[in-house]
């Protein structure tokens, strides 16, 4: 239902969806920027959380993992230097240690993550985020 209007950069009024949509966003990531652009083009009001500055807490990460049906390593960027430095490929590390590693080193969290009405999508590819709006 369209019930809110916003002005575009050109000054045009466009309808905005009134639903709670949150994106865990890294403005330096092309996939994250693409996902945010798709949400904006769809007319969705988006709460942007720059997760490198404001990382999610353990409860939030655990909730995201449960909703995506993923294990912690599946939400981690294994190509990041920090992943290797912390030896996070060690299979003896338990779930809590991996989640704590993401909190303390948010660069390890795969992005973007979009949450809408208790549904979660990882924006890989970016178009996947449109499935939940």
Q: Model regions: which residues?
A:
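Local sequence-structure signature of Cys/Sec-based thiol-disulfide redox active-site neighborhoods
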Residues: 19-38, 42, 46-49
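Thiol/selenol-based redox catalytic cores and closely related redox-interacting motifs
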Residues: 51-133
């Amino acid at each position: 239902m369209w019930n809110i209007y916003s002005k575009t950069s050109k000054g045009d009024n466009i309808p905005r969806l009134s639903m709670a949509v949150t994106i865990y966003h890294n403005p330096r990531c092309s996939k994250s920027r693409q996902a945010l652009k798709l949400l904006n083009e769809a007319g969705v009001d988006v709460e942007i959380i720059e997760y490198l500055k404001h990382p999610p807490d353990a409860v939030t990460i655990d909730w995201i993992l449960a909703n995506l049906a993923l294990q912690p390593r599946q939400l981690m960027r294994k190509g990041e230097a920090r992943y290797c430095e912390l030896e996070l490929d060690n299979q003896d590390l338990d779930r809590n240690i991996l989640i704590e590693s993401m909190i303390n080193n948010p660069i390890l969290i795969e992005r973007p993550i979009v949450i809408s009405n208790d549904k979660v999508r990882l924006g890989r590819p970016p178009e996947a985020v449109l499935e939940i709006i």
